């Protein structure tokens, strides 16, 4: 009788506080398979559970998404902020799969019993401990959402991103044009408003447990991108909301963005989300797509409808974060997910079973991070050592236990080298995927270009290193290096000038405007002219920051600007027609607003723009001096090493006859006391031979012609002399003969 009462109480709690429409299936006692290796057993675990009488073997691997400094913030009745560190929750999160269903995902917390999700091909289960049980009993229930019947995103925020689709690429584009996905980390700061706090249990640890569970599932989804979603901290508005949460999602977003700028400035995060409970919301969220690293727009609102459970809510957050990192919603006629629901599908929040990102999402993300480097995602992780997750064969990413991964059947370009079903190499081939793998399944030789330079002064070509089928990480000049004859600075691999920025927006011929235009445009208290926002109000630039606020351009033709810019502002100042665009009317794909001067643009002697302020240039991040470290024969790159000029050998740019230059980071370097690389040495000897041949040959031809002409002239002169002397010689001979004859006659 007591057991039945406890079971009914537990089901009532699930129904009331999780929003689940789950169907109770079974009570199970999970059985842990012990390992003799204590270190391995801490990283990997195996549990056996039963669902409806059928045993399932869960292979789990430790999942790290809570940083060491993770805190939970709450407010007391007096409005004072307090923080706690739930340290016990930080080391008990795992993800994996069920051996009986290889195409499955399992995300569990084992802090106090097993709690989490089991996603099979077309069904999802939730598992939670039966807290009143003394026999480690758990309940397993089938997850089932009602259709929330709400729109995905507020229109006036989704359209901002759609005006600039330059980041989109055709689905049949070559993978070799996309850089390899390196491990990246996205820090999300979560705030739970009062209504959702009450809906989830109205108790700090219970709500914290549910939010951590949701982010754990979101992190599992993003492992496809090698992107770890970390919950930097959690804030609970347990007594009262700090801002009004009335109105639609887009209205709340504006208020939240203003509040965030004032109160979260010292708390580390890449993006902050406010989670709001709304029984029947018009939209499930609002955010600024493609703005993950833009401090002016790094926020979002996620609505929790009454009709969904924690799994469905995790999909909503994953979709919103997907928009932040450059994804778009899937076109079901072109995008597919093998035996799974596509996360960026509009129906995903109510679907059951395993969910993955589609081929379209993979292309969107790979292109976004390769062309518009999301620098904030490339920081060092503050996590405990993150153990490798289960590899996903066919996602185009070479992961642990994979010999190759050329994508799915449609994408794979190395079918004779790599088995796209098993991600194993065929036969004795050397490689089966990557830009440094040849069509003959061999590694490209050292020095083969694999990523071309996109800026002649600030970005460098990368080469295959001869040991990997992947291209080395991108190398470029350290931020602050002078370019364009000392009139501009390199920043994130580009020579940043207002002329280049204006030409990209308004077309060929457009240039950066004179100072008078910048001064006028950035000194007014209007929504279209400002140096950022504070409390949702436009912020005029200080005089020192005038050249770092709104971008001002001049152009030769009035209507020369590109058609995708719909909001253009004209000003007539000191005989100049100054042109700018309204804030938010055109977003760069790296998350910054085209309306503003790009970071790294020169704003004075040894000064450049950073986040709309003019700052002193510092070659930050590394102790690299071109004069001492590179001996004046190279420049510093983004890894703090010397990028040597041709004829000088890295790492310290010593003179080396025949060296192509470069750095130890660009892939074309091979340690040797004598030569840079055999290929580079031989190649440059060949180049010198060819160059010498083409230099000497013309001189040889000219010399031969001169000698030939000189001989011709000499012969001609001799013939002329002979012709002049010969008649006189004949007369002299005749005279001598006549004398002789006369002498004889006498």
Swiss-Prot record:
GO cellular component assignments: plasma membrane
Annotated ranges, domain Disintegrin: 390-479
Tissue-level expression: Expressed predominantly in adult and prepubertal testis.
Transmembrane segments annotated in the record for this chain: 688-708
InterPro entries according to UniProt: ADAM_Cys-rich, Disintegrin_CS, Disintegrin_dom, Disintegrin_dom_sf, EGF-like_dom, MetalloPept_cat_dom_sf, Peptidase_M12B, Peptidase_M12B_N
A Pfam family that the UniProt record links to this protein: Pep_M12B_propep
One Gene Ontology term from the biological process aspect of the record: spermatogenesis
Keyword Disulfide bond: yes
Protein name per UniProt: Disintegrin and metalloproteinase domain-containing protein 18
Organism: Macaca fascicularis
Gene, per the UniProt record: ADAM18
